[in-house]
């Protein structure tokens, strides 16, 4: 395995792009990233593991939905900087409910959907989204019980309520700026930051997620 890893050209973050294809039809299912550890895990288990840049963690495809990708073959391109993984796809690859993530086609000045959904993504992911928020909340609570040196969360708690409120205000302003710029990626990034700081504020004030859900 190590000799294969030496052949691959990972970028300065340790990532290498992966194109995933249906092994029967050769339909391109998705594009993602992988690191050495998830690649090893993929080869050990026969199921594709990626690296989630947004969550900064190893990610087993299908761990939430059950829509696993069973590996049939892995190829390396001529420059050794991209992988092609052919898989047997369980149900569908795309979190939107489509079989492939490439379900939209540029048609003139419009985007046209070229395939129907094969599952209801809201039913599949709704409970998981709430679970992710709870996991983040629990990590923040754990930082108050088991502080870690260099932890930004602990830094906020050490500085106190005024610092936390200042950060919430700053992040809310960043969301507004992102929205005015009409940049979806910027808005998503800033909203994520705002949600994190709101969760820190909730923990500091002793407010649980259940308290919020009851008001919804």
Swiss-Prot record:
One of its GO terms (molecular function) is ATP binding. It comes from the Bacteria. InterPro entries: His_synth_HisIE, HisE, PRA-CH, PRib-ATP_PPHydrolase-like, PRib_AMP_CycHydrolase_dom, PRib_AMP_CycHydrolase_sf. Pathway: Amino-acid biosynthesis; L-histidine biosynthesis; L-histidine from 5-phospho-alpha-D-ribose 1-diphosphate: step 2/9; Amino-acid biosynthesis; L-histidine biosynthesis; L-histidine from 5-phospho-alpha-D-ribose 1-diphosphate: step 3/9. Gene3D superfamilies: 4.10.80.70, MazG-like (1.10.287.1080), Phosphoribosyl-AMP cyclohydrolase (3.10.20.810). In the N-terminal section; belongs to the PRA-CH family. Residues 1-132 are annotated as: Phosphoribosyl-AMP cyclohydrolase. This is Histidine biosynthesis bifunctional protein HisIE. It catalyses: 1-(5-phospho-beta-D-ribosyl)-ATP + H2O = 1-(5-phospho-beta-D-ribosyl)-5'-AMP + diphosphate + H(+); 1-(5-phospho-beta-D-ribosyl)-5'-AMP + H2O = 1-(5-phospho-beta-D-ribosyl)-5-[(5-phospho-beta-D-ribosylamino)methylideneamino]imidazole-4-carboxamide. The lineage of its organism: Bacteria, Bacillati, Bacillota, Clostridia, Thermoanaerobacterales. Pfam families: PRA-CH, PRA-PH. GO terms for biological process: L-histidine biosynthetic process. It is found in: Cytoplasm. GO terms for cellular component: cytoplasm. Keywords: Amino-acid biosynthesis, ATP-binding, Cytoplasm, Histidine biosynthesis, Hydrolase, Multifunctional enzyme, Nucleotide-binding. Coiled coil: none annotated. Residues 133-216 are annotated as: Phosphoribosyl-ATP pyrophosphohydrolase. Signal peptide: none annotated. Its EC number is 3.5.4.19, 3.6.1.31.
């Amino acid at each position: 395995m190590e000799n294969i890893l030496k052949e691959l050209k990972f970028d300065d973050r340790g990532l290498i792009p992966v194109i995933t294809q249906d092994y029967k039809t050769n339909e391109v299912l998705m594009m993602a990233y992988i690191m050495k550890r998830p690649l090893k895990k993929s080869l050990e288990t026969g199921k594709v593991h990626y690296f989630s840049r947004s969550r900064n963690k190893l990610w087993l495809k299908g761990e939430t939905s059950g829509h696993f990708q069973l590996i049939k073959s892995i190829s390396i391109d001529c420059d050794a900087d991209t992988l092609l993984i052919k898989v047997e796809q369980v149900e569908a690859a795309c979190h939107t409910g489509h079989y492939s993530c490439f379900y939209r086609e540029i048609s003139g000045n419009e985007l046209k959907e070229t395939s129907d959904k094969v599952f209801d993504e809201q039913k599949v992911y709704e409970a998981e989204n709430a679970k992710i928020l709870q996991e983040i909340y629990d990590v923040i609570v754990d930082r108050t019980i088991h502080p870690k040196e260099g932890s930004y969360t602990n830094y906020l708690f050490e500085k106190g309520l005024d610092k936390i409120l200042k950060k919430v205000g700053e992040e809310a302003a960043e969301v507004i700026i992102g929205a005015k710029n009409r940049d979806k990626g910027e808005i998503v990034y800033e909203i994520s930051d705002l949600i994190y700081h709101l969760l820190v504020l909730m923990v500091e004030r002793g407010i649980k997620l259940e308290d919020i859900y009851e008001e919804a």
